[in-house]
Amino acid sequence: RIVDTHHQPVDFANVALLNVSDSSLITGGVTNENGQFVIPCEVKKAIVKVSCVGYKTYCNAYRTGEVGAITLEDATINLQKVVIKGHRKYISRENGKLTLDVQNSNLKNIGKATDVIKYIPGMLYTNGKYEVFGKGEPVIYIDGRKQTNTSGLSLLSSTNVKSVQLITNPGAEYDAETRSVINITTVHHSLDGLSGIVGAEISKHKNLSNNEEVNLNIHKGALDVFLAYQYDNTRSDIRYDVNQFNYEQDTFHEISASEYSDRSRSHDYNVGMNYAINKNHTIGGRYLGSISNYKMLDSPFDYMQTYKNDELLTSTDNKTEESEKERFHNVNLYYIGKLTDNLQLNLDADYVYAQLKHKQQVSETSRIDAVSEITHMQNDQRNRATALKGVFAWNMNKNNRLDFGTDFSKISSWGMSVNEEGKIADDQFKNKETKYAGFATFRLSASKWKGSIGLRYEYIHAINTDQGEVKNKTNYSDLLPSLSLSTMFGRVGMNLDFSSRVSRPSFRQLNNSVSYNNQYHYEQGNIYLKPQYVYDTELSVNYSIFDFKLDYQYIKDYIHPTVVAVSGKPGTVTWMSTNAKDFQQLGAQCVVSPVFGCWRPTLTVGVYKPYFTLSYNGEQLDYNHPYGLFAFQNVVALRNDWLFRCDFFWNIKGHHGIYEQNGYSSFNMMVQKQLLKKKLTITLKAEDLFDSSKLNDVKRVNFVVQNRKVNNFNRCIIASISYNFNSFKDKYNGSGSAEDEINRF
């Protein structure tokens, strides 16, 4: 392993093995991002020569298999006070993967990992959720460990992020439901003692919210113990304006407007350890828990008017009381072992338990006769999963590698929904699913060409029970290939990727539990919902500061929202998910990322053209309007550790499935100052300055057309302060084996 004088890994260093007798070249290689290298060699002793730009060349003789860690010294040249400055490219693409070099850019001091992710070209951030343009919500990993929520991201300082990688066409090694991946690699520290980070944040939307965190790490020799805790108190407000027409038989016209103020309090905690038995074997464990409580505090107004054939049918003032309690527990154990010089084994075991209790009371008072009607709903859902995963990595030779492995999971979800008034039938449901999976990926490198071919097999046995009766019993058997091929033509890089994925319904989409919104509007699961299959092909080309990508997606059994009439209740509908025959879309994206001194702008422009048709009001309707993205992000690093950020995002109008979404935008600014040798960071942000991120969409399906306007009151001011000592790093090495199951919960 090659490291610098600060014990940081040196990547892309050239390693040559020379003959001891005459210093002739035997073979060679290049270090990876962890500073590691594996060079098959038949001689018992050789001279190891290591060279890298910015470091002194290192030479020494070693016996085969006894090299250990090699430290490179910085190469310093005095040029009589002449200062030469260069700017390293911080956005790059290799083998189809887009990488941000955080440590060698101004993003290093941007704040937290949550802020770094926003700077990935093509990344959208709306109402607390990340979305890859044209791909949906990504799965996020930190050092190979799946993140089940954003707590791990918010606890990770950007100073401890080495790089961020976006994979938009994951290979066979990733779970079949993963459509895009964000891999965060952190900076590794080897100092013994106590390290950590403490921080606090306060934000003002319509109401005040606050967040406090502490993260501690104790490292001593081969033992590493970590502890993290975060408290979050979020106040949020939201307004809905809905205009809906129901043309099933008579024409029902619903006009409603509502505004809610709520509070969510959560406690997140993480404790674990790593222990290096020796240089070849490491074990560890982790417990991750979360307790969250949600409560609706106020509803300034909530009214609805319903017309039947243009005659007023009802006019009501509504009052909603709602609360949720959620508990989450995850235990993970892992082993990482180097079995031989060329073979490594990773083992993970997981146990997950989650519980959600939801209570709702809706009071509807008529404006016509002042009669009140109260509806109580109570839902209780529990989820349990056990999972095992094993992965082998076999370096066959210097050009070829084979990764193969298997995983197993058994998950169950059960619960009930109760309506005291008997308006909606009570329900008890239970879903069970057992999964067996295996995969293999062969990677090769020859001259200017690099590639990989992968194959993943998954077998699923699922049983859905409602009211004690088996409603659906299904076996899924899927063989999912993937392919990647990349090359260079001079300074032009090209990459072709293909992947096949499957997206299975969440348990909420499958269960028969009913959510009551009002007397004309219910929401419910669909136990007959089938998985959707995604076939994705990408071609990417990069040159200098330019990166261009073409993408074609074909989705079989496409999952989308639909509406059905409620029997015996004219004008009342239930929204649920269903399958369409297929869905297609063709997209393009261009990223330009130049550097002008202290200013690093990034321009991203993208467009997707969908091809989708459904039945609406007895006729076939096309949902084919293209949608787009325009983003202009700017970071300016000033003297004395001042940082300034100014970003503009514009989501351009178009069809997202059955939704025709109007355009919306956001303009954000940030000022940051670092003190005490960059250990203390003070940040002030202003987000959605022009209050232009309000959502407005229209959905037409079956016999219903609904226009919805949503205001999340995103305009806000945020102030935060954090203090780092010894550059904290959570060094947990487990990857987790239940990522798919946790995501579906």
Task: State what each model feature region is.
Residues T185-A200, R239, N243, I255, ...:
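Surface-exposed extracellular loop regions of Gram-negative outer-membrane beta-barrel proteins
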Residues D268-N293, N318-Q467, M488, V492-G493, ...:
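Face-selective signature of the C-terminal outer-membrane beta-barrel domain
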Residues A385-K389, K435-A437, K530, D536, ...:
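Outer membrane beta-barrel strand-and-loop segments of large Gram-negative receptors
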